[in-house]
Amino acid sequence: MSEPVMRRTQSGEAKQLRTPAFRFHSPLANVLSLCSVLSVLSFVAPLQVHAATDASATVYSIPSAKAADSLLLDIDNAGKRLVAVGDRGHIVYSDDEGKTWTQAKVPTRMMLTALAFGDDKHGWAVGHDALILATEDGGTTWAQQFSDQEREEGAPFLDVWFKDDSTGFAVGAYGALFATTDGGKNWEDAGDRLDNPDGYHLNAITEVKGSGLFVVGEMGSMFRSSDDGETWETLKGPYEGSLFGVLGTAEPGTVLAYGLRGNLFRSTDFGTTWTPIKVKSPRGKLDFGLSGGALLKDGSIVIVGHGGSVLKSTDNGLTFTLINRPDRLSLSSATADDKGNLVLVGQGGVHVTSPTGEDASPKQ
């Protein structure tokens, strides 16, 4: 029998949840879960590692020839470079459109859940123990900026967003919202800017063109800001299940939110009203969780999920095509190279594909 799940409210009061929001399982069990790879796997208790003999010594990720094949949870473009992050503190990068990958030296063995670049050189990665890492050379080297191992027993940050090389936000478990205006030299706990008394997990943050910032999370929670995150409005969303991702589009005010069981919603008024987007597979309604995605340079949108699902839209999310990759490996995030080929990450590491998500290319 599992222990009751307790959560601190913003007032500091301990509150028992009616239903456990997340449970800790083995990494394999979480990979195979129907929930989002990004949000569920990020709560896996990190694998035990041998403690450094000197408690003050920095513990680096272990070099591995298979780092690009390990569980990876997010990927982003740093100029023409591709950078991906994931399990055991692995960060890998490629300068040849994903043909070959180099493992970066990273000062952690904690699971890294997300990353974002403010420009070609300045990037941030977040993960367990409320960890934030930063790079100033496009992902070649990394340094720790922030960590809070005492925060909710090492609960993770789940997403990070940067406007430029100075202004950014990190969001995560138990309502975590942290802000910086100096490139991460200082991080401010900005959770009290949100009306989130139950401390729902915040799973994703994005910018919506011409409108502002948007955050989604547990229990269908939604928040928007029109003033660069200084103040936030709580919205009544279209769905009471967990939302794992949110994307702006090339169309001003248009935003997509997605999560469990293939649920995908579109708004053209910055989240005031929503329309469900029906996506069908050859066997009927898409029933796999959707976990991550990206607005690509050409204005198209890609969303990925469990079971190798790859959704693609060229009309700002009004309609989507769907393919289920033959390997059926769960996917957590995606981007594209300069030729328009999709580069997917998740179970099995990096998958370089055609623009539709098919025709995997071998890694080296």
PLM feature spans:
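Bacterial N-terminal signal peptides
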Residues: A29-P46
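N-terminal secretory signal peptides that target proteins for export/translocation
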Residues: M1-S26
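Residue-level hotspots at or immediately adjacent to binding/recognition sites across diverse folds
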Residues: S2, V49-Q364
